[in-house]
């Protein structure tokens, strides 16, 4: 068998372990992809991966192999209204941090209701805005989340936008961030949001990973979060910005592997 043919076979085997999965949250339909490990255990731990602002489920696939090798099922999804590329709902004018939190809670409860899931091992992994949403979710349903992984979490979102829109009357009907239109609702909600007042309600193990060249999220916020959580550590990736590439991503995955062993 040639190397090319072998690669195609391996890609096919990997694809067979992935399936599209829609999960409902009331009237909201959430699109995602579920990846299963190559073992026959009846119950598996599960990791739910939450993308950042204007991201998509595609970002979560970076975690599949590492987590599948550890025996985890992995679910990566598109937040409804969370991205112009969302297959769930791409109307970003309705983007909402609290809406995303409710969607993530619905996903957690879906998996906890499945017979092949080890309900004592449900892990949340959140990137950027998805990190904020994951932290809020873990604080709201702490007994349902076994471990929390935050990659460059945007805990700064309320402070950042409140410095721009100091009072509710300042908020326009439409704001564009990186050419993504966002409605009044998003900014009205975060105006009153104080993540550091609530995130420490989660008492389980926490891993925060961030690059020391991140220009979007302050390292001070991550250090503050680590100090607040009961059991947490911060891993800093030298030279990495807001998001990881290549060797940076591999370093992050190694940290996640060690954290979940």
Question: How should each PLM-predicted stretch be described?
Answer:
Residues 202, 208-210, 214:
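Short beta-strand/loop motif that positions the catalytic acidic residue
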Residues 59, 94-115:
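Alpha/beta-hydrolase active-site loop
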Residues 15-40:
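N-terminal cap/lid segment of alpha/beta-hydrolase-fold proteins
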Residues 67-87:
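Conserved alpha/beta-hydrolase
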């Amino acid at each position: 068998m040639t190397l090319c043919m072998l690669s195609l076979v391996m890609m096919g085997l990997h694809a067979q372990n992935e399936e599209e999965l829609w999960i409902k949250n009331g009237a909201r339909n959430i699109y995602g992809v579920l990846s299963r490990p190559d073992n026959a255990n009846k119950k598996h731990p599960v990791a739910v991966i939450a993308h950042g602002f204007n991201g998509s489920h595609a970002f979560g696939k970076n975690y599949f192999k590492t987590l599948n090798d550890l025996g985890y099922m992995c679910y990566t999804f598109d937040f409804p209204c969370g991205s112009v590329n969302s297959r769930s709902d791409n109307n970003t004018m309705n983007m909402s941090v609290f809406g995303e939190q409710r969607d993530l809670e619905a996903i957690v409860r879906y998996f906890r209701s499945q017979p092949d899931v080890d309900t004592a091992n449900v892990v949340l992994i959140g990137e950027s805005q998805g990190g904020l949403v994951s932290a809020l979710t873990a604080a709201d349903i702490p007994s349902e989340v076994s471990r929390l992984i935050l990659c460059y979490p945007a805990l700064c979102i309320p402070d950042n936008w409140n410095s721009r829109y100091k009072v509710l009357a300042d908020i326009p009907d439409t704001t564009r961030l990186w050419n993504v239109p966002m409605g009044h609702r998003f900014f009205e909600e975060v105006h009153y949001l104080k993540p550091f007042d609530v995130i420490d309600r989660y008492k389980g193990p926490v891993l925060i990973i961030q690059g020391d060249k991140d220009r979007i999220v302050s390292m001070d916020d991550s250090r503050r979060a680590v100090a607040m959580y009961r059991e947490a550590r911060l891993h800093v990736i030298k030279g990495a910005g807001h998001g990881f590439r290549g060797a940076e991503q591999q370093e992050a995955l190694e940290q996640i592997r060690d954290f979940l062993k």
